[in-house]
Amino acid sequence: MRIGVIGLGRIGTIHAENLKMIDDAILYAISDVREDRLREMKEKLGVEKAYKDPHELIEDPNVDAVLVCSSTNTHSELVIACAKAKKHVFCEKPLSLNLADVDRMIEETKKADVILFTGFNRRFDRNFKKLKEAVENGTIGKPHVLRITSRDPAPPPLDYIRVSGGIFLDMTIHDFDMARYIMGEEVEEVFADGSVLVDEEIGKAGDVDTAVVVLRFKSGALGVIDNSRRAVYGYDQRIEVFGSKGRIFADNVRETTVVLTDEQGDRGSRYLYFFLERYRDSYLEELKTFIKNVKSGEPPAVSGEDGKMALLLGYAAKKSLEEKRSVKLEEVIG
């Protein structure tokens, strides 16, 4: 299967490099608006075609599927163009910051009978998959409380924060998707609170850098997500589910498993610091799954609807923070 990648920033580059490691895929074409970056990556990756105009890549008859990894504001236009060209499409999160655009992306890809796969890579982390299986199999009984800790080692640039849609649509959106995925049910109500504790410039940009979100699922189960834009000790990613028969917990990944014990106690290596280190394997598994879905004709493992639901939860959290009250999901679906 010949694949084209649009957007050669951090994520697009990781995906392009990963495609070179997948037997069932050929990285056939790349596109980026920066000509110098395009030339550099064409030579580095050894791809056949390089297009400055992403529409030329989409219209290339030799391209079977497209990875849209460009800036969020370009996603809807490019995904819809892929649908009209009958190309299966993988789109990085968020699908869009505009719910009407997301609906159109879903509608157009369905009409064209092509896959729309949303890039939520954390579902493909082997530890989180194991935790999901245990919850699904009833190992801990009926789930009562989900707790997700998701803290970045450092905030992104302010220019990025200003266009990101805010912490709930940029950062917590991963956790909203994981909450639905792990629990296997929908959220009906959201309460969010947040503060500016890391960098006052983030507040001036109209966002918070520290947040807690409480979720109420349709079964009555509860979820708690805590986020920070800066954890000085590294990339902090943990999930716990407590249920009627026990609990299951996925801890952080460290650089090594070596632990030194002396008169000062136990000392281990630090947590992985950068998200591309922590989730490198999950990005590869995510792409393998996309390719498998396309070749088999089965529904995407992470659908456009999944992307929409995470976005809705993000908007519910924003509304809750602004209005200082809990928000039912139906209030933002309309």
Curated annotation (Swiss-Prot):
Similarity section: Belongs to the Gfo/Idh/MocA family.
UniProt EC number: 1.1.1.18
Gene Ontology molecular function: any one: inositol 2-dehydrogenase (NAD+) activity
Keywords: NAD, Oxidoreductase
Pfam families, per the entry: GFO_IDH_MocA, GFO_IDH_MocA_C3
Catalytic EC class: oxidoreductase
Main function: Catalyzes the NAD(+)-dependent oxidation of myo-inositol (MI) to 2-keto-myo-inositol (scyllo-inosose), and thus probably functions in a myo-inositol degradation pathway together with IolM, IolN and IolO. Has no activity with scyllo-inositol and much reduced activity (78-fold lower catalytic efficiency) with 1D-chiro-inositol.
Keyword Oxidoreductase: yes
Pathway: Polyol metabolism; myo-inositol metabolism
Highest taxon in the source lineage: Bacteria
SUPFAM superfamilies: Glyceraldehyde-3-phosphate dehydrogenase-like, C-terminal domain, NAD(P)-binding Rossmann-fold domains
Organism listed in the record: Thermotoga maritima (strain ATCC 43589 / DSM 3109 / JCM 10099 / NBRC 100826 / MSB8)
Reaction catalyzed: myo-inositol + NAD(+) = scyllo-inosose + NADH + H(+)
Name the UniProt record assigns to this protein: Myo-inositol 2-dehydrogenase
